[in-house]
Amino acid sequence: MVAFFLPGPRRDPRIRRTARQGMGFLVQHLLIMGSSRILKRNQEMAMNKCSVLLNRAREFEPSRANGGYILSTSSYPQIRQYAASPDEHLRSLPSLLPPPPGQELPLAYLRAQRQSSGNYRGIQAQRRPLIDQTGALQSSFPESICLKEELQSLSMPRNSPNAGRNLVGHPHSSSKSSSKPCHFHFFRGYCKKGVNCQFFHGSVPELHNPRQVHPFASLSKLDMEIRELLIGIPPPVAVDRLPSMYFEKYGKPLRPDGWLTESQQHGRTGCSLTSLLMGLNTIRVVEREHGQYHVVLVEDARKKYMDCLGLAHSCNLMDTGTGSNQIYMTFPVHSKFTDDDVENYFKQFGPVSGVRIPYQEKRMFGFVSFLYTETVRLILSKGTAHFICGLRVLVKRYMEKSELRMTWLKSVSGSQVDSCLKVTIGHTIAKAPSKKKKEVKEQCSKDQGPIKIYRKNKQFDYREHRTSGFGVTNEHYIGNNMKKKSHRSDDLDEASAYEDSDEIILPDSLGLY
């Protein structure tokens, strides 16, 4: 039988070339998918091996298995060998003590180098020489993704302070990582951006550099470093800027021992950064407008900031009034301490220039003078009660008579006074409350002398009135000018009464101040 094949339409060679190219793309896609599946399978196998090894290690040393030291210091073939080895072999491994408090891992001078290769090679077991603090070589570990994820998921819980770090203790940061410290992390204790924050979240233990790890044994060195930092900078410097400036100058964060952020103080021992700065000797914390805290040097604070700024060098930020370098103290009658005891007690707040306790049979008060006004402010910020030689001593700021007058004028000024009476002291006129007017009446009635306080719509009397305590002279009041008459006899004080303005000039002896 003969078969005849009819010639069909001729195929275009371009179609054959396109089909050949499509097959090539399909093969490449299958190869990529196969390699990704192989990579995923290898990672799952590696994670399973790590899980098996960790679970077996937990049975022997539960408290030391979470550190992941075996995983971090062993290569992947060693991990597979450990996972398949019997229990006797695991028990024969050297028992490792937990790392000291200053270190999270016993690794120093280690730098994580990530591989930025475009192809997929699976798990790469590259070895890195590790040197501990004693100079001895340690084994290396592979920088595989599975080990990091295994340590993060199994060994380090989320609430652990080491969570979110890789094996060498560095935080997982993006390519935009900066050396500037994060404001929220340093002052609030947390950052809402977490590991994606572009600023520095590090603390002292995670730097792993002896030149950067600097726990402050005392505040003296911190005081000296901050003083050197502030010298040459125009004052004042905001407290918020201080951590970043400190890190730029010294290359280490401002995190001394015992320091906690504001959010970490509840139920824990420590102090805030502002309270820490208040404990230093060569700098002062001042409060400016809008409640902002700034730091200045002591000499700058004495020159220009002590009078115009509120001194915040105390936790309760008490306002102690105007500047005065003396305090007035009262104490029990049976007190037996001497002037030297008083001086030695107040020397802890600042230099003392003198102590004066009047000699009396029953002494109950005294005066202490200081070289600087801020010393008085600091003493009063601690409270009014102090104990010298076991005896309770009450202190308050010493005020001159002129200051007492101005204080009383400020206290009676405003809307809480009665406008029916005015008291004139020198060239200052201030409104006095009706209570003071009542005291004037009682004082005059005790002396049993005539007194007239003239009211409006009454006949004006030009006669002079006398009392046993003081003399009263009538005067005219015309516009804004006051025409004053003075009368003085037998060393008596003087006072004047006015019909139109109801103004009375009262003597100092009435105790209005």
Curated annotation (Swiss-Prot):
Residues 218-299 form the HTH OST-type domain. Residues 155-180 are annotated as: Disordered. Gene3D superfamilies: 3.30.70.330. InterPro entries: Nucleotide-bd_a/b_plait_sf (IPR012677), OST-HTH/LOTUS_dom (IPR025605), RBD_domain_sf (IPR035979), RRM_dom (IPR000504), Znf_CCCH (IPR000571). A zinc finger (C3H1-type) spans 176-204. It comes from the Eukaryota. The keyword Nucleotide-binding does not apply. Keywords: DNA-binding, Metal-binding, RNA-binding, Zinc, Zinc-finger. It comes from Oryza sativa subsp. japonica (Rice). This is Putative zinc finger CCCH domain-containing protein 51. Residues 325-411 form the RRM domain. GO terms for molecular function: DNA binding; RNA binding; zinc ion binding. Residues 170-180 have a biased composition (Low complexity). Pfam families: RRM_1 (PF00076).
